[in-house]
Design a protein with these regions (language model features):
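Conserved acidic donor-binding segment of nucleotide-sugar-dependent glycosyltransferases
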Residues: 144-153, 161-166
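Carbohydrate-associated surface elements
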Residues: 9
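Short alpha-helical donor nucleotide-sugar binding micro-motif in glycosyltransferases
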Residues: 90-91, 98-103
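Conserved donor-binding/catalytic core segment of Leloir-type glycosyltransferases
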Residues: 22-48, 61, 173
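A short, well-ordered alpha-helix in the C-terminal region of glycosyltransferases
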Residues: 161, 168-177
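Aromatic "clamp/platform" in nucleotide-sugar-dependent glycosyltransferases that forms part
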Residues: 111
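Short hydrophobic beta-strand element within catalytic cores of glycosyltransferases
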Residues: 128-131
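Nucleotide-activated donor-binding/catalytic signature segment of Leloir-type glycosyltransferases, i.e.
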Residues: 73-91
């Protein structure tokens, strides 16, 4: 047994309690990362459209920048969900933690992701996470929902379950921290 796998990690936040969610009626589902083909942003937009066909009390945030940003803005508009979709642009440092703490669900639908630390950051501040089975972190995160990146129905169902079933939200939030 000469080989040991050492996975990526995030530094623990010294004062995680400082990041609190603002009480609100609408739920917030966040994609945070580069808006590029590898990250699967179009799957996030399509999953959002399907969730919004079932319920209207959810808002979707795409935080980040990249070569597909304009395409995603147009896709959200073409899908008829622009009024429920927000694009923040690039976030860094404290802004990342604040955005994730405001999220009821974090989603990483990556097509190709060697590891991906953003779900770890999300779970650290209590945001339940839905991640792509194709990401490296899928092998170590036991308290995240895992879907194939192309399975938009599974993603939409997972989002809907977390935002509509408080027990599921609570369990994923508490077990993820």
């Amino acid at each position: 047994n000469k080989v040991t796998t050492v996975h990526n990690a995030v530094d623990p936040l010294p004062n995680v309690e400082q990041f609190k969610k603002t009480p609100r009626k609408d739920k917030v589902v966040t994609f945070l990362g580069r808006i590029t083909m590898q990250k699967g942003p179009e799957y996030f937009v399509e999953a959002a459209r399907r969730v919004l066909q079932k319920t209207k009390d959810v808002r979707f945030v795409m935080a980040g920048s990249g070569d597909m940003m304009n395409q995603m803005i147009h896709l959200a508009a073409k899908s008829g969900i622009a009024d429920k979709f927000h694009f923040t642009g690039f976030l860094k440092g404290r802004q990342v933690h604040e955005m994730l703490a405001e999220s009821d669900v974090y989603m990483m639908p990556s097509v190709s992701e060697p590891f991906g630390i953003s779900p770890l950051e999300a779970m650290q501040v209590g945001a339940p996470s839905i991640i792509s089975k194709q990401s490296g972190c899928a092998e170590i995160l036991t308290n995240a929902i895992k879907t194939d990146y192309w399975d938009i129905d599974a993603m939409a169902d997972a989002i809907y379950a977390i935002v509509k079933y408080p027990a599921m939200y609570k369990m994923l939030r508490e077990q993820g921290i």
